[in-house]
Regions:
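Flexible coil/linker segments and helix-coil junctions enriched in charged and small residues
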Residues: 37, 44-48, 146-155
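Residue-level signal for alpha-helical transmembrane segments in multi-pass membrane proteins
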Residues: 38-43, 60-64
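Hydrophobic alpha-helical transmembrane segments
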Residues: 41-57
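Transmembrane alpha-helical segments and their cytosolic interface motifs
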Residues: 20-36
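Juxtamembrane membrane-interface segments of multi-pass membrane proteins
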Residues: 1-9, 73-93
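Charged, low-complexity intrinsically disordered regions
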Residues: 82, 86-91, 95-141, 145, ...
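Transmembrane-cytosolic junction motif
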Residues: 19-22, 59-83
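Cytosolic juxtamembrane N-terminal segments of multi-pass membrane proteins
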Residues: 1-23
Length: 295
């Protein structure tokens, strides 16, 4: 058994205890609901108010059960994330409720400004001297619909749901480079370029402040690495080099760092969980952000 699996044994024990309490309270709520519905049928004359009064009791147990699920997220998941992160990175900070700020994403010009923004699972740290920030983000746009009778409804459909990475390296560059599968939201002042790779041109659109800067980063090997990274993710992917930063947006409709409350925290669960974390150093290693080029 690995050292990490030994460390998570107490967390799995806590999970079992919390889930037992969760299941117990949910069972009580279900049984009480069945009894109340049965009484309602028997005493139909008392009607709605009879049911409403007694439904307060099973609702109480449902809320109590939910409190155990919330405690799992606030304590066990938090401890588990810190265990994994501290094992892989330096200067680690994690906050389940925090995210990369909307303004940071807006200023890249890669995606349109959202009407509603949310995020979670913010991670900050360093790996081999490269600092990084990453979080889940969800971007929504406001849409109005008017039917044939003039009734207006407003919805906020999601157009970006996934992960946003920000890597910072010692060297500051003067140019700007955007690599996207579709045209970026803002390409003002940038030149559209093609590479000698047909496979790369077919997959990505390339915009840069100047040609020399673009191909300083986009060597043939680097283009291969970007294509490999694209294959690692479902959905679309965005790259943005500016100053001493690299932004990567992954729009894959996925929630990262999820640990199921109902399932054991075992080797299989940890493999999937660590896979989400390992994407962070994989990008640093694959794009060689630790090389002299970025120092």
């Amino acid at each position: 058994m690995s050292e990490l699996l030994k460390k998570i044994e107490p967390l799995e024990k806590k999970r079992k205890e919390l889930f037992a309490q969760f299941s117990k309270n949910m069972l009580i709520a279900v049984i009480l609901t069945i009894i109340i519905v049965g009484l309602f049928i028997l005493f139909l004359e008392q009607g709605f108010y009879f049911v409403l009064f007694f439904l307060i009791v099973p609702i109480f147990f449902v809320l109590k059960a939910q409190s155990y699920a919330n405690k799992f997220k606030e304590t066990i998941k938090n401890e588990l994330v810190h265990l994994v992160l501290n094992d892989k990175f330096d200067d680690v900070y994690y906050d389940r409720h925090q995210s990369i700020p909307q303004g940071v994403i807006d200023q890249t010009g890669l995606v349109k400004r959202p009407d509603r923004f949310s995020g979670e699972d913010f991670i900050k740290g360093t790996y081999k001297g490269v600092s990084f920030e990453v979080s889940d983000v969800t971007l929504r746009e406001r849409q109005e619909h008017v039917d044939s009778k003039g009734h207006r409804t407003v919805t906020y459909p999601v157009y970006f749901k996934g992960r946003w990475y920000v890597y910072k390296f010692p060297k500051t560059f003067k140019g700007t480079l955007k690599i996207c599968e579709t045209r970026p939201n803002n390409a003002k002042g940038l030149e559209k370029l093609d590479t000698e790779s047909m496979a790369f041109n077919k997959k990505f659109k390339l915009y840069a402040s100047d040609k020399q800067y673009a191909f300083y980063h986009l060597t043939p090997i680097m283009m291969e690495k970007l294509l490999e990274l694209e294959k690692l993710h479902r959905g679309s992917i965005y790259f943005y080099y500016t100053g001493n930063e690299l932004h990567i947006g992954v729009n894959d409709s996925q929630d990262y760092l999820e640990i199921p409350f109902r399932k054991a925290i075992d080797e299989k669960a940890m493999k999937a969980f660590e896979g989400d974390v390992d994407l962070i150093p994989a990008i640093i290693n694959e794009l060689k952000l630790t090389s002299d080029k970025f120092k």
